């Protein structure tokens, strides 16, 4: 990545900044137990996390997305998640070091997510990131979510930083499309919730990494004449 006088780094939340899948998996397992069913293979749920609650309950219960049984299960999932959205979620290995490096470099950071604010805020607070993050943009704050550029443009506006001075990091094509259309630099991460049929190499990101610590090197290169 060429030098870009970076001023801010924005993260997608699920599958990029945080591994929130353990809470999703625990809830779907509890739901199956409540419905008299045995545990499901965790990977079935993890593979479709990026598809949201509907995709996760469909996978957990072996249903098609258009099954009439999915909607009541989705609502049950969301009700349970409201009470247990910040129990097992953790930052990915290497994220604490990355955030420390961002702050040490004098940059600011924030989160742009498609997760509703009623879930996103408690998670950020519980993990101690609410005070450190300078912006949190959720679907509640915009008329169009990612892949539309509106959430990224709102975050940049709230920070008072031109999008060209921002790096947006995500684990889904919609993240890269949103960042690119907003005018930010983009980084795709392979460690997140990527569907087995997806290939980040085809997304058009400025850089692709396999581990959060690699992003420290990306920032170093972006901030120097190397």
Curated annotation (Swiss-Prot):
Pathway: Cell wall biogenesis; peptidoglycan recycling. GO terms for molecular function: metal ion binding; phosphoglycolate phosphatase activity. Disruption phenotype: Deletion of this gene increases ampC expression and promotes beta-lactam resistance similar to other peptidoglycan recycling mutants. This mutant strain is hypersensitive to the antibiotic fosfomycin which targets MurA activity and thus blocks the conversion of UDP-GlcNAc into UDP-MurNAc as part of the de novo peptidoglycan precursor synthesis pathway. GO terms for cellular component: cytosol. InterPro entries: HAD-like_hydrolase_sf, HAD-like_sf, HAD-SF_hydro_IA, HAD_2, HAD_sf, PGP-like_dom2. Coiled coil: none annotated. The active site is at 12 (nucleophile), 14 (proton donor). It is an enzyme of class 3 (hydrolase). Keywords: Antibiotic resistance, Carbohydrate metabolism, Cell shape, Cell wall biogenesis/degradation, Hydrolase, Magnesium, Metal-binding, Peptidoglycan synthesis. Its cofactor is Mg(2+). Mg(2+) binds at residues 12, 14, 171. It catalyses: N-acetyl-D-muramate 6-phosphate + H2O = N-acetyl-D-muramate + phosphate. One of its GO terms (biological process) is response to antibiotic. Belongs to the HAD-like hydrolase superfamily. CbbY/CbbZ/Gph/YieH family. Phosphatase MupP subfamily. NCBIfam families: HAD-SF-IA-v1 (TIGR01549), HAD-SF-IA-v3 (TIGR01509), PRK13222.1-3 (NF009696). Specifically catalyzes the dephosphorylation of N-acetylmuramate 6-phosphate (MurNAc-6P) to MurNac. Is involved in peptidoglycan recycling as part of a cell wall recycling pathway that bypasses de novo biosynthesis of the peptidoglycan precursor UDP-MurNAc. Plays a role in intrinsic resistance to fosfomycin, which targets the de novo synthesis of UDP-MurNAc. This is N-acetylmuramic acid 6-phosphate phosphatase.
């Amino acid at each position: 990545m060429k030098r870009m006088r970076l001023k801010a780094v924005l993260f997608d939340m699920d599958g990029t900044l945080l591994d929130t899948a353990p809470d999703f998996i625990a809830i779907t397992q509890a739901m199956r137990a409540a419905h008299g069913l045995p545990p499901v293979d965790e990977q079935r749920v993890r593979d479709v996390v990026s598809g949201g609650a509907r995709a996760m309950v469909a996978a957990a219960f072996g249903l098609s997305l258009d099954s009439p049984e999915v909607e009541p299960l989705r609502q049950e999932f969301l009700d349970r998640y409201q009470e247990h959205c910040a129990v097992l979620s953790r930052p990915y290995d290497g994220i604490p070091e990355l955030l420390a490096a961002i702050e040490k470099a004098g940059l600011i950071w924030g989160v742009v997510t498609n997760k509703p604010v009623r879930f996103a805020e408690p998670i950020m607070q519980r993990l101690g990131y609410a005070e450190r993050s300078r912006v949190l943009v959720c679907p509640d704050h915009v008329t169009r979510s990612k892949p539309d550029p509106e959430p990224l443009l709102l975050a940049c506006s709230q920070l008072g930083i031109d999008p060209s001075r921002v790096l947006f990091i995500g684990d889904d094509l919609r993240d890269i499309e949103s960042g690119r259309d907003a005018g930010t630099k983009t980084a795709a991460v392979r460690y997140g919730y990527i569907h087995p049929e997806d290939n980040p190499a085809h997304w058009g990101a400025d850089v692709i990494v396999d581990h959060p610590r690699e992003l420290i090197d990306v920032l170093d290169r972006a901030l120097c004449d190397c």
